[in-house]
């Protein structure tokens, strides 16, 4: 809805900010609450 959100890590680490541009998928880029994903954490500009 907003184009951004946060991912919760399984290892208990801090939540990770994610922007829709970082989603690697075709078509409409969206995630749903509770959806399992894999990701690499990168430091970006704020």
UniProtKB/Swiss-Prot annotation:
Residues 1-46 form the CSD domain. Gene3D superfamilies: Nucleic acid-binding proteins. Induction: In response to low temperature. Keywords: Activator, Cytoplasm, DNA-binding, Stress response, Transcription, Transcription regulation. PROSITE patterns: CSD_1, CSD_2. GO terms for cellular component: cytosol. Its main location: cytoplasm. One of its GO terms (molecular function) is DNA binding. It holds the Pfam family CSD. It is found in: Cytoplasm. Homodimer. This is Major cold shock protein. It comes from Photobacterium leiognathi subsp. mandapamensis (Photobacterium mandapamensis).
């Amino acid at each position: 809805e907003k184009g951004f959100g946060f991912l919760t890590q399984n290892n208990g680490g801090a939540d990770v900010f994610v922007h829709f541009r970082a989603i690697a998928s075709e078509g409409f880029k969206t995630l749903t609450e509770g959806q399992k994903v894999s990701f690499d954490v990168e430091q970006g500009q704020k």
